[in-house]
Amino acid sequence: MTTIASGHGIATVAAGKTLDVWFPAPQLGALAATVPSELTALVGSDEARGVTRELVKVEIDITAAPTDAQDAYLRLHLLSHRLVKPHGLSLEGIFGLLNNVVWTNFGPCAVEGFESTRARLKAAYGHVTVLSVDKFPRMVDYVIPSGVRIADADRVRLGAHLA
């Protein structure tokens, strides 16, 4: 069994803190040399949310404890993509590596200064819906596993392994 996993992703960053990372195609094994072109198109800033979207390349040892938020998000994606079974990788200390995030209909936002962010979002787009304030996002905003039905997406977090 391989203990290496990897992925190219897009990290949402605010004031140097990683709010989330989306890995559309995580894999077991070494990092692929080619970055998917659809990811490079997502790099940039979102002034209304006060964030930047950055391309990240992550390769981890799944038997070691996660080292940062990017590593943690890759592990959550591996579970939800069903590439690794529950207890098949180390999640030791993961809670402390993730930031609290305001999850909105426009994407993740920093908790600090959110009322100013809300005002910018309202000015740009109108109504803003806050879905939750939590460390773990809804799974379906990142992964749609095949062969399952999810009646209430708000109750299933990234990192869930649905059979």
Question: Which stretches of residues belong to each language-model region?
Answer:
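Structural signal for interior beta-strand "rungs" in well-ordered beta-sheet cores
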Residues: 143-163
